[in-house]
C-alpha cells in the first residue's frame, strides 16, 4: 500500500471499518502494538528501558508519518449501523483527528459519487457480505 502511494483509498462495503483502519495504520506507519498493553510488562526478565525505547521510536515514526499528506479515504456501507460502527471504531483505534480526511457514509454500490478519480491512483479493498450477512437472492442481485 505504501509503495503504491494511492490518492484514494476506498472500501465500498466497509462493515465495521477494519480495512480502513488497517490502511490508516499502514499509511501512518503506526506499529500494531503501539497502544496495546502486554502481559510481558510484568515479567521479571522484561527489559523495561529497551521496551520503552522501542515504543518511543515507533511513536516518533508514527508522528512523523502523520505530517505527510494522506490519501482521501472513503468508507461506505449500505447499512447505517455499519457506518456508525466504522466511525466509532476509527475513533477507538486512535484516529479521531483524521476523521475529517475520511468520508464515511451510508451508500449502496449503485450510489457511488464521482470521486474525481480520473487519472488518480486508487486502492479499493472490501470484504463483500457472506454467510448470514448475505441476505436473500432478490436483494443480492444488484450486489453480485
Where are these regions (language model features)?
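Conserved S-adenosyl-L-methionine
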Residues: 1-111
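Hydrophobic alpha-helix-in-membranes signature
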Residues: 11, 127-128
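Short loop/turn elements that form and flank the Walker-type P-loop nucleotide-binding site
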Residues: 69-70, 118-120
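Short conserved loop adjoining the S-adenosyl-L-methionine
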Residues: 111-118
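Short SAM/SAH-binding signature in class I
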Residues: 120-127
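A short, flexible beta-alpha/helix-coil linker loop
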Residues: 130-133
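Glycine-rich S-adenosyl-L-methionine
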Residues: 135-144
Amino acid at each position: 500500500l505504501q509503495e503504491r502511494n494511492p490518492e484514494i483509498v476506498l472500501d465500498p462495503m466497509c462493515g465495521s471499518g477494519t480495512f480502513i483502519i488497517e490502511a490508516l495504520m499502514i499509511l501512518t506507519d503506526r506499529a500494531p502494538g503501539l497502544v496495546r498493553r502486554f502481559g510481558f510488562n510484568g515479567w521479571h526478565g522484561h527489559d523495561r528501558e529497551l521496551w520503552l525505547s522501542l515504543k518511543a521510536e515507533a511513536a516518533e515514526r508514527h508522528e512523523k508519518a502523520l505530517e505527510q499528506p494522506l490519501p482521501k479515504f472513503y468508507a461506505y456501507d449500505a447499512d447505517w449501523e455499519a457506518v456508525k460502527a466504522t466511525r466509532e471504531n476509527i475513533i477507538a483505534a486512535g484516529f479521531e483527528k483524521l476523521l475529517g480526511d475520511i468520508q464515511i457514509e451510508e451508500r449502496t454500490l449503485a450510489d457511488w459519487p464521482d470521486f474525481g478519480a480520473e487519472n488518480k491512483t486508487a486502492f479499493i479493498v472490501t470484504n463483500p457480505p457472506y454467510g448470514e450477512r448475505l441476505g436473500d437472492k432478490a436483494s443480492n442481485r444488484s450486489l453480485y
